[in-house]
Amino acid sequence: MEPPLSKRNPPALRLADLATAQVQPLQNMTGFPALAGPPAHSQLRAAVAHLRLRDLGADPGVATTPLGPEHMAQASTLGLSPPSQAFPAHPEAPAAAARAAALVAHPGAGSYPCGGGSSGAQPSAPPPPAPPLPPTPSPPPPPPPPPPPALSGYTTTNSGGGGSSGKGHSRDFVLRRDLSATAPAAAMHGAPLGGEQRSGTGSPQHPAPPPHSAGMFISASGTYAGPDGSGGPALFPALHDTPGAPGGHPHPLNGQMRLGLAAAAAAAAAELYGRAEPPFAPRSGDAHYGAVAAAAAAALHGYGAVNLNLNLAAAAAAAAAGPGPHLQHHAPPPAPPPPPAPAQHPHQHHPHLPGAAGAFLRYMRQPIKQELICKWIDPDELAGLPPPPPPPPPPPPPPPAGGAKPCSKTFGTMHELVNHVTVEHVGGPEQSSHVCFWEDCPREGKPFKAKYKLINHIRVHTGEKPFPCPFPGCGKVFARSENLKIHKRTHTGEKPFKCEFDGCDRKFANSSDRKKHSHVHTSDKPYYCKIRGCDKSYTHPSSLRKHMKIHCKSPPPSPGPLGYSSVGTPVGAPLSPVLDPARSHSSTLSPQVTNLNEWYVCQASGAPSHLHTPSSNGTTSETEDEEIYGNPEVVRTIH
């Protein structure tokens, strides 16, 4: 194992030698060549020539690293270490070499200052000076083969100990990313990052490079460089240079903070806006989230459709979970956004938000509340007022009695309205009169015999249906428990109502169906046709419905015993059958029948039938028994 590079103490080891020894095309995060050509602009070579080993004391991240582009292809898989303070820089080269060796062995002491270089480091606790290494008479060994060049805008630090072996494979190197537009030169010269304006001119030995015109990353301090190199508007004002800081340098931000800002801004813009807005758009307030879209537009400027391999979803989730401790230390919590003003911020109104943000907002959208109004009129007001005058014929809709006003209280749920009416208006068991005083009630003050009947009646006005069907998938609700009880028999198949006639085993789910069936046994025909001139009658309404189809379609080819002519009306035509002339002399055609209830009239049992054919020479009778009910297709005719 060869000794570390820092212990060899070469007389004048320069990074320019390493840069000129092997030149490889720079690669970005995806492993493809750089976006804007070779990142080493014209000032990079000249600036590297003046960089010496002592300049690495304040920025160990610029040191050579065994990591190549293939190790840094995925930035999301590498850990990001928290920030720490930097060692002070000393002019002595041996001491700087010793500190560089100590940084390799103990990586926790390194930091990543924003500016880099000796001018951007602030000593926290100066360590004891290391003893100078004894000079060796032997000539220095040749420099090792240069490693592949690091990524533009990336530096690496050793974040995990692996003993003092110094091997690259036994240590966990952490990728740090400088998000400024001039990352290559600024990291080695201490030049301003992005739009951070610290000094207008550089030193004679280290000239400040011109601002990069194709900046791709936002500044570490939350600013963005303008086209002319001047500082742009502040995107994150809480992260600006602190006035009280020595040298006007801001607090150092580690790579995790910078990557989080860029990814969160890009995710917020892609999720909420779906488009990039100008990075210099005016804002009404620093806390307005329109600045997030501006930051995202600035961060994504110049990338086009290139895949950044950034886990924007994870960054957005982390940003939604809350700011990290480092952000909370430097910036106060953001204020809630102001109410939308269409004249100033028309971009705030997005009815259809794409992606997860739209689904979340649809979930959080409050439902429209339905206002339920109580229209119960106080009976005390009705008692103190004179009776209303009789309505003139024709009666218009009657106004409230005597001008009495209803309760008019509004409620958000049906449960609240029902409780209000029951407790405040209906009253308890002390009430002897059970009268409905709902506005425009058709009962007109007619009382009920019991309180529960009044409560059931009030459901007609309120629309309450408190009895839902318990069977899954049904979804029917009922206002009365008796109706629900009858309905549940359709699911269970229960038929508790047995036919009362001997020898008949028919059963029914409700008593009304059993009553209809009983006419089969009594030979009563209470359901007769209402078409004038047709005297057909039946014992069951289903048979009458089958008969009514004859009046709605063409008759058979021969006139038949019914006496209908061969010319009929098509299906759906008005019910105006053409009867036989012998029968039509004493009958008139009925108008169009539009309601099923007008098709038949249920007569009382034993009532005489008065609709007979005048030409009949005997008593009209029909032998209709159980088989016609069992087979509804069979229609008996009158002879």
Swiss-Prot record:
Keyword Nucleus applies: yes
One annotated Gene Ontology cellular component of this protein: nucleus
Bias (Pro residues) ranges: 124-150, 331-343, 385-401
GO biological process: cell differentiation; central nervous system development; regulation of transcription by RNA polymerase II
One annotated GO molecular function: zinc ion binding
Annotated keywords: Developmental protein, Differentiation, DNA-binding, Metal-binding, Neurogenesis, Nucleus, Phosphoprotein, Repeat, Zinc, Zinc-finger
Record-listed Phosphoserine modification sites: 554, 558, 576
Gene3D superfamilies, A to Z: Classic Zinc Finger (3.30.160.60)
Keyword Chaperone: no
Domain of life: Eukaryota
Record's subcellular location: Nucleus
Region called Disordered, residue ranges: 113-171, 189-251, 323-355, 379-409, 548-568, 607-639
Coiled coil: none
C2H2-type Zn finger ranges: 434-461, 467-491, 497-521, 527-551
UniProt feature, compositional bias: Polar residues: 612-621
Described purpose of this protein according to its UniProt entry: Essential for neural crest development, converting cells from an epidermal fate to a neural crest cell fate. Binds to DNA.
Family per similarity comment: Belongs to the GLI C2H2-type zinc-finger protein family.
Protein name (database record): Zinc finger protein ZIC 5
